[in-house]
From Swiss-Prot:
Any GO MF annotation of the entry: polysaccharide transmembrane transporter activity
Taxon lineage: Bacteria, Pseudomonadati, Pseudomonadota, Alphaproteobacteria, Hyphomicrobiales
Predominant location category: periplasm
The protein's annotated pathway: Glycan metabolism; exopolysaccharide biosynthesis
Designated name of the protein: Exopolysaccharide production protein ExoF
Region forming the signal peptide: 1-31
Length: 421
């Protein structure tokens, strides 16, 4: 009797534990999908990484979270990461995927694990870029993906102002740089809005916004948002599948308990009939009291077993109901998140439109007030850019223009004849 009660409770506990483990593995898988786009980036000194490690233990059917290893780590001057247990791990020149793979392999060998731990490595902070030369504020600046020379110069306040005679020309250059950054950001926001509307409308593809049909590189932005939408869709499906599997397990348990209850009910019926017959014989003095007591005990045991089955069945039904509610909540939360993201994107677009209008007004004013600024197109050849980049451990200077991509650790040199007048 006690054994059956414990088994009922244990089954319910295992179902809840199963759902928790599945949710954790889904989170790690989603994190791994988000890293796929950063795999081509090669790590370097001063890059900061966020490491998370978990291990699926096949024998126990559970997930172990290696919190002692998880955390933020910086690639040191030697080009290595220093992790607990693992020690120094070469990282410079490798991708995040390669580092994650090595962490899993080393931990498996170090601890003699049967299952290889799953490591998730993502960029927490890129190493900075540096501005030098004729920049308003030279120095160190944080790197951001898709950074170009023009955007980097804008971070440094644009070209240096030399005197009042060049003020309007400088205003034009600064406003032009800010406008270029704002136009690029507007394109990203328009594509993001199109992706959110597609997700809300349950569409499989993202239509190109009308405003961007003739914009260069719009297809790249669309491909990036499409990859993100597919990743998010897969994550939601994994979570829903986990809940569906849990409900299926609980339903199977409920059906098994129902069959067991039918069997026990039949046993109770037979035991009751035997007890009644013995009672009748005992009244006539034809049956032993010991046999009567034995049958009474049998009836009581079967009744207790039926009670345990009913309790376990009720618990399984409650868990199934909770899993169904969790599925509904997941869908509702997903829809609410999409609506909130769309609202935030619309607000950012409105703010950016105002900023873009201000930048264009400043450019117009500079052109009207200054002949230097009005002739800036002809004078643009006097502004030169170059990038000093480490190649094979040696600094190499390469020619650049405003649209040249910048990599983490680059030094951007700006030279302009206009600033020397």
């Amino acid at each position: 009797m006690q054994s059956n009660r414990r088994s009922g409770k244990s089954a319910g506990s295992r179902m809840v534990s199963c759902f928790t483990r599945l949710a954790l593995l889904a989170a790690l898988a989603a994190s791994g999908a988000s890293l796929a786009r950063a795999d081509e980036y090669r790590l370097g000194v001063m890059d900061k990484l966020r490491v998370r490690v978990a291990e699926w233990q096949t024998a126990e059917g559970a997930v172990r979270d290696w919190s002692a290893v998880s955390g933020d780590y910086t690639v040191g001057p030697s080009g290595s990461l220093s992790l607990p247990f693992v020690g120094d791990l070469p990282a410079s020149g490798k991708t995040t995927s390669e580092v994650a793979e090595e962490i899993g392999v080393k931990m498996q060998k170090l601890f003699g694990l049967r299952d290889r731990p799953s490591a998730s490595v993502e960029m927490a902070q890129y190493r900075p870029v540096y501005l030098s030369g004729e920049v308003q504020t030279p120095g160190e600046y944080p790197y951001a993906p898709n950074l170009t020379v023009l955007k980097a110069v804008s971070l440094g306040g644009g070209l240096r102002r030399a005197d009042n005679g060049q003020r309007f020309a400088r205003d034009y250059i600064n406003a032009s740089g800010e406008s270029a950054v704002q136009v690029a950001e507007r394109s990203r926001l328009l594509i993001r809005r199109a992706r959110l509307l597609a997700e809300i409308g349950k569409r499989d593809t993202i239509p190109m916004p009308e405003e961007l049909k003739n914009v260069p590189d719009a297809e790249k932005l669309l491909d990036s948002e499409t990859a993100l939408m597919e990743s998010r869709d897969k994550r939601q499906k994994r979570q829903l599948d986990a809940l569906a599997d849990l409900r299926s397990l609980l339903q199977s348990e409920i059906e098994a308990l129902a069959k067991k209850a039918e069997t026990q009910a039949r046993q109770l019926e037979l035991a009751t009939e035997d007890r009644d017959k013995v009672d009748s014989l005992a009244e006539k003095g034809l049956a032993l009291s010991q046999r009567k007591l034995s049958l009474e005990q049998r009836v009581a045991d079967v009744q207790a077993s039926l009670l345990d089955i009913d309790t376990a069945s009720l618990k399984a039904k409650q868990d199934a109901s909770k899993a169904a509610q969790d599925e509904t909540n997941l869908r509702n939360d997903w829809d609410a998140q999409l609506a909130q993201e769309l609202q935030n994107t619309e607000a950012e677009l409105d703010t950016l439109t105002l900023k873009l209008g201000t930048s264009r007004d400043l450019m117009t004013e500079a052109l009207l007030q200054s002949a230097d600024a009005a002739q800036l197109e002809e004078q643009a050849a006097e502004i030169t850019y170059s990038i000093i980049r480490d190649k094979d451990g040696k600094p190499t200077e390469i020619a650049a223009d405003e649209n040249t991509p910048v990599l983490p650790g680059d030094v951007i040199k700006v030279n302009t004849a206009l600033a020397m007048r």
